[in-house]
Amino acid sequence: YHRVEERVPFSLEYFNKITNGGLPKKTLNVILAPPHGGKSLMMCNFAADFKAAGKNVLYITCEMAEEEIAKRIDANLLRVSMDDLMQMDKSSYDKKMNYLKSKTSGKLFIKEYPTAAANVNHFRTLVNELRLKKNFVPDVVFVDYLNICASSRMKMSGSINSYTYVQAIAQELRGFAQEFNIPVVTATQTTRGGSQSSDL
């Protein structure tokens, strides 16, 4: 317990304060939000910050298209709105992105899977392939998001309630984080009333 825990720091000091210095490796970190509560937006913001800080970021999306995730992360990196990003001409965009690339060594890889079709076995294969074929080793992995992944060891059926199924996915993601010695960030959906629960 005297060993210093290795962490991936946030760019925002507030998050470093509440996490004691950033995301610990080998952990599953879950953002809790109601439907349309900004789960993907927050994860894209964090992903952009980690990339800008020189970290290799793997963003796995089971909901939005790769292109939409890339747009959100680019807007965060360039510190512009989505509207401004879409109206930016190609030469201005290229100039800004080349400047960013010269300032940071962090890389970003985005992978899209069909909703409810991908599980940790797919993610494990992806990480291994990226390491072997592209020499890309992630420092942090984002999974967007927990409730719409699949379990690698449990089939969803009428006899299994959704809580048990999502719990199994969370356990598998935590094992994935431990296996690859990285923090995994995901999100889960709650009802608007559930976010006010005294259990949280």
How would you name each of these model-derived features?
Residues F109-F176:
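Phosphate-binding/switch loop-helix module in NTP-utilizing enzymes
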Residues P24-N29, K55:
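Pre-Walker A (Motif I) flank of P-loop NTPase domains
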Residues Y1-K25, L100-L108:
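Core recognition of P-loop NTPase motor domains used across DNA-transaction enzymes
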Residues K51-A52, Y163-T190:
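Substrate-engagement module of ASCE P-loop NTPases
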